[in-house]
């Protein structure tokens, strides 16, 4: 049960971060006075995940959650 709570908290935390990143991108685009195309949105999501290095982050999280370090 405790592991489930950790996982849910982690998912909530990562969701909050991704929402804040999207909001920052949207605010930056509103300053330009133009709307982003669908392709630009997809491209920004891909670059954000590459920059965040999610696979390494997931390995560290799993290591700490399951004490396999």
From Swiss-Prot:
Q: Does the record's keyword annotation contain Transmembrane?
A: no
Native organism: Nidirana pleuraden
State the InterPro entries in the record. Answer: Frog_antimicrobial_propeptide
- Give the intrachain disulfide bonds: 63-69
Q: Which UniProt keywords are given for this protein, alphabetically ordered?
A: Amphibian defense peptide, Antibiotic, Antimicrobial, Cleavage on pair of basic residues, Cytolysis, Disulfide bond, Hemolysis, Secreted, Signal
Extract one GO cellular component term from the record.
Answer: extracellular region
Q: Is Signal one of the keywords?
A: yes
Q: Name one GO biological process term.
A: killing of cells of another organism
Q: What is its main location?
A: secreted
Please list the tissues where expression of this protein has been recorded: Expressed by the skin glands.
Tell me where in or outside the cell this protein is found: Secreted
Regarding protein family, the annotation reads: Belongs to the frog skin active peptide (FSAP) family. Pleurain subfamily.
The name this protein goes by in its record: Pleurain-A4
**Organism's domain of life?**
Eukaryota
The residues the entry assigns to the signal sequence are 1-22
State which residues form the propeptide.
23-43
Function, as annotated = Antimicrobial peptide. Has activity against Gram-positive and -negative bacteria, and fungi. Has little hemolytic activity on red blood cells.
């Amino acid at each position: 049960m405790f592991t489930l709570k950790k996982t849910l908290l982690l998912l909530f935390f990562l969701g909050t971060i991704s929402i804040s990143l999207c909001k920052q991108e949207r605010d930056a685009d509103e300053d330009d006075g133009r709307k982003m195309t669908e392709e630009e949105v997809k491209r920004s999501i891909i670059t954000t995940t590459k920059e965040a290095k999610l696979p390494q982050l997931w390995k560290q999280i799993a290591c700490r959650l399951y004490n396999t370090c």
